[in-house]
């Protein structure tokens, strides 16, 4: 072959190699990139429903979902938090994150730009105002005495834009200076007349701000899902679909939801308002006592239990004979070394010791926070009845080590067809379910107020 032909052949071969190397078909798929990187990058929002830090530890519903998915893939998780949802979508388009997990509503506009996972929650969107500040409007046409403020780029912003000029009297604006939680707080302070918020965010904030009142619902049954980039590469998208299918069918998704939101759905204005009032007026006289005798427990948890038991009344007495700050029975008081149940310090010390005893009796394999919820239920109903409910749970195919499963079976202890086959018999099993739920709400409120420097 002539030299010139050889040279031409070499050039053509090199060019073909370059073209092949640059061809989209040879690019690694998204899953391969994640596994090669050994890191899953997840964009999220910093807020109480998605992602936050508690004692320097990453926490949040979206964090728990993402961490479990990363573990499933065998890679590390890198949460990429932002305060603005627009920044998250920009990062997703640029390939700076693999997924956005931020409690996103799957709107029609967003669905044209991104792919969404199967929904893992359903929420509603509500117009909120401060109770007592104005007459409750029943629809958007009746909002003539103020302005609605929403977060720019949010699904609420998208909804208001979709109205166009159909309601000429409606005044609204979008802001990038405040997030959804701040807008709810500004409703309470009077800086904002109305806002639109997701039902889950409202459930959480009403524990601290009971005067947040729902005017009406603007959207029902909105799917919440993860967002992924559009494109022909289905590798990571398929893994996400498989993941949500698995955690839904196994009950793990319900378990994670219960851990984060299982106690916030029930709201009682009077109960919450009275609790906040007691925190301000009564609790300061007992904080040091709770701290002194909490031992390995969180003093705020001990205080929450005490409020549920006695409303922090050291002389409380029930018709069944339990009495004091921690409402101890006489046998329990004697076993815990309490001489006077009406002595606040002795009662708190005895209650703390008894709760620690219940914690030690809960099987060590049960992780937190379920371990604590089981111990609190036992504090209320007795360890024997709790074990009966766990046995019923297992017989019915539930997980006896998950509070979300056991709390569904505790009320069955009232029914003869179930309690006749148990060791300890009849019990008012619905009471510890309410008991634990109330304490979780009080505990979360105390933690929030403490972090705000209000205790």
UniProtKB/Swiss-Prot annotation:
Main localization category: membrane
One Pfam family cited in the UniProt record for this chain: SBP_bac_3
Annotated catalysed reactions: Exolytic cleavage of the (1->4)-beta-glycosidic linkage between N-acetylmuramic acid (MurNAc) and N-acetylglucosamine (GlcNAc) residues in peptidoglycan, from either the reducing or the non-reducing ends of the peptidoglycan chains, with concomitant formation of a 1,6-anhydrobond in the MurNAc residue
S-S pairs: none
Region (Non-LT domain): 22-264
Residues covered by region (LT domain): 265-455
Signal peptide (UniProt feature, chain positions): 1-21
UniProt cross-references to Gene3D superfamilies, sorted A to Z: 1.10.530.10, Periplasmic binding protein-like II
GO BP: any one term: cell wall organization
SMART domains on file: PBPb (SM00062)
A single MF term (Gene Ontology): peptidoglycan lytic transglycosylase activity
Superkingdom of the source species: Bacteria
GO CC, one annotated term: cell outer membrane
TM region(s), chain numbering: none
Keywords: Cell outer membrane, Cell wall biogenesis/degradation, Lyase, Membrane, Signal
Annotated membrane topology: Peripheral membrane protein
Keyword Nucleotide-binding: no
Listed EC numbers: 4.2.2.n1
Subcellular location: Cell outer membrane
Residue positions of the active site: 309
Record-linked HAMAP family: MltF
Protein family: In the N-terminal section; belongs to the bacterial solute-binding protein 3 family. In the C-terminal section; belongs to the transglycosylase Slt family.
Domain notes: The N-terminal domain does not have lytic activity and probably modulates enzymatic activity. The C-terminal domain is the catalytic active domain.
Protein role: Murein-degrading enzyme that degrades murein glycan strands and insoluble, high-molecular weight murein sacculi, with the concomitant formation of a 1,6-anhydromuramoyl product. Lytic transglycosylases (LTs) play an integral role in the metabolism of the peptidoglycan (PG) sacculus. Their lytic action creates space within the PG sacculus to allow for its expansion as well as for the insertion of various structures such as secretion systems and flagella.
Protein name: Membrane-bound lytic murein transglycosylase F
Name of the encoding gene: mltF
């Amino acid at each position: 072959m002539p030299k010139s032909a050889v040279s031409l052949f070499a050039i053509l071969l090199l060019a073909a190699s370059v073209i092949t190397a640059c061809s989209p078909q040879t690019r690694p798929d998204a899953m391969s990139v994640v596994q090669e990187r050994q890191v899953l990058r997840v964009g999220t929002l910093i807020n109480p429903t998605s992602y936050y830090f508690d004692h320097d530890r990453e926490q949040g519903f979206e964090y728990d979902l993402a961490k479990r998915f990363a573990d499933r893939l065998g890679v590390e998780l890198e949460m990429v938090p932002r305060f603005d949802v627009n920044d998250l979508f920009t990062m997703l388009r640029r390939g700076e994150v693999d997924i956005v997990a931020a409690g996103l509503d799957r709107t029609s506009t967003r669905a044209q730009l991104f792919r969404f996972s199967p929904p893992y929650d359903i929420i509603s969107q509500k117009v909120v105002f401060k109770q007592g500040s104005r007459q409750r409007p029943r629809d958007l046409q009746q909002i003539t005495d103020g302005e609605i403020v929403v977060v720019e780029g949010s699904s609420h912003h998208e909804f208001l834009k979709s109205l166009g000029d159909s309601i000429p009297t409606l005044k609204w604006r979008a802001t990038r200076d405040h997030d959804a939680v701040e807008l709810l707080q500004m409703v309470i302070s009077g800086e904002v007349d109305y806002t639109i918020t997701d039902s889950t965010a409202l459930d959480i904030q009403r524990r601290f701000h009971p005067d947040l009142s729902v005017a009406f619902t603007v959207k029902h049954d909105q799917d919440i899902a993860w967002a992924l980039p559009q494109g022909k590469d289905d590798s990571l998208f398929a893994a996400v679909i498989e993941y949500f299918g698995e955690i839904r069918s196994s009950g793990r998704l319900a378990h994670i939801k219960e851990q984060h939101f299982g106690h916030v759905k029930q709201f009682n204005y009077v109960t919450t308002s009275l609790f906040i009032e007691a925190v301000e007026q009564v609790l300061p006289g007992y904080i040091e006592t709770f701290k002194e005798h909490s031992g390995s427990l969180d003093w705020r948890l001990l205080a929450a239990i005490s409020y549920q038991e006695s409303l922090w009344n050291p002389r409380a007495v029930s018709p069944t004979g339990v009495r004091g700050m921690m409402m101890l029975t006489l046998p329990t008081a004697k076993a815990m070394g309490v001489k006077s149940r009406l002595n606040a310090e002795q009662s708190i010390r005895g209650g703390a010791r008894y709760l620690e005893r219940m914690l030690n009796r809960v099987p060590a394999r049960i992780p937190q926070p379920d371990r604590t919820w089981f111990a609190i239920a036992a504090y209320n109903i007795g360890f024997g009845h709790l074990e009966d409910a766990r046995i019923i749970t297992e017989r019915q195919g539930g997980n006896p080590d998950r509070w979300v499963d056991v709390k569904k079976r505790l009320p069955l202890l009232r029914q003869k067809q179930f309690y006749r086959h148990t060791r300890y018999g009849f019990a008012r099993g619905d009471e510890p379910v309410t008991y634990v739920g109330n304490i979780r709400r009080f505990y979360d409120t105390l933690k929030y107020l403490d972090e705000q420097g209000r205790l």
